[in-house]
Amino acid sequence: MSLKSTTSSLTTNNHDKTINSVQSLVNGTGTVADHNPYDEVPYESYPYAITNPYHLSTLATLFGINAPEVENSKILELGCAAGGNLIPHAVLYPNAHFVGVDLSKVQIDEANKNVRALGLKNIEFHHCSITDIDDSFGKFDYIICHGVISWVPKIVRDKIFKVCNRNLSTNGIAYISYNTLPGWNMVRTIRDMMLYHSSSFTNIRDRIAQSRLLLEFVKDSLEHSKTPYAEVLKTEAGLLAKQTDHYLRHDHLEEENAQFYFHEFMNEARKHNLQYLADCNISTMYLGNMPPKVVEQLKAVNDIVRTEQYMDFITNRRFRTTLLCHNDLKINRNINNDDIKKFNIIFNVIPEKPLKEVDLNNATENLQFFLNGNKESNLSTTSPYMKAILYTFSENLNNPLSFKQVTSEANTKLNNTKLNEIKNELLNNAMKLVLQGYISITNQKHRSKPVLDKPKTTQMVIYQAKYTPSMWVTNLKHEPIGVNFFEKFALRYMDGRNDKKAIIEAILGHVEKGELTLSREGQKIENKEEIRKELESLFTPMIEKFCSNALLV
């Protein structure tokens, strides 16, 4: 069964494929307009879960910082594009205040259009340079600068650090992401190749097209080569070839593209009285994920920046997501098992068997649980206590649970007789799994089970489903969740007032108007009752998907 919208405004890139080799290139024609490159090829404005203020708040709490409460905070984003990373928060947290700054007028105009349509009063966007930010902007509890500092001149980079100091509240947290060395060395080789190859073309669309041809040329040229250099180059070229035009334009064909060793970045941060708090990918900080011999040697370094710099060398790291705070704040890096009790926990595991088919008290049965539903990544256990814990998490996918909730629900699965054993099992394992990157901790609250008779999503999701061409919507964890055309039409009507029958009738209306077509085994379904049956068969799996992906409230 496949779905297709006849009114989708999505377009595909039809670059000329008749040029089969670099040798047949011709000189480019046309000129690039004298304005911001992000106006020429706007960067699609995504939500980035790693920048979620709740995630920043959680990591600050883990390391002993009393971070500001997100729902009543002031949040600034530098290089906000069209607001895709900021507007969803403004919808969810009406008592917080949000400010976005971007140099692209096209992007800011789009952001303001969306704000007006959503009727938001707690967010504002400014078409200006980061260098225009001064004390009049005020203090912010969270400052987000994602995918900017590596792509701007030094004068702007210096200003970013200055803003992260002068405009950051006392216990505030600043997030900056950037390209790092040594990992970017190979990527830089390909970037240099694309810049060299496309330099004779003035039109940016031609430069993007020629860069794609070069990537194909590189892959074809090295097809039979098995040297380490060739293997790495082929892999990098293959990854880049799959990226969007706006990614190639702004991440690789941009005039500015600076990479830093971590210690160099931190030297700049220290000049502005900022200190290293954490990396948003906390598992990258954990020495226990390194080989034992490496761990013993790095433990002797006794300097967090130097330690992580050595780890970057070893892992060939290419991108960092660094959290900074004022240098007078006291950071506690002594994490212990009991710290898990401070947070709510998300552990997305899918059991190999339904609970009703399992005897949890059978300590001889080894059960598998798949991480994020991936059968290639799993954990197994014979422990009745851990089985009860994991089944509890599997019933609450993407929904944070407190330590008390997990242990209490798990205990009910064992007839309310093993609470202490369950607590000990969770305490002995949870924090290690956090540091290994399997379990997520958060300051976000647990959500009540959604009412499925009349499903309800957020105002943001309904708006995205109705008015944007993108085939994704933003969930409650600030993640983009892919949707198909049927799901996108259905989401329009999930405002808590429509039941299954009403939603299906509404979608049928779109089918009758020719806005949505359904097919089975390549054949279009024409009969209205057959269409209705098809929609009904799709409805329950869709609702299950929305529940497990934090799209319903």
From Swiss-Prot:
Pfam families to which the protein is assigned, alphabetical: Methyltransf_31, MethyTransf_Reg, PKMT_2nd
UniProt xrefs under Gene3D superfamilies: Vaccinia Virus protein VP39
Disulfide bonds: none
Coiled coil, from the record: none
SUPFAM superfamilies reported for this sequence: S-adenosyl-L-methionine-dependent methyltransferases
Name of protein: Uncharacterized protein RP789
Organism: Rickettsia prowazekii (strain Madrid E)
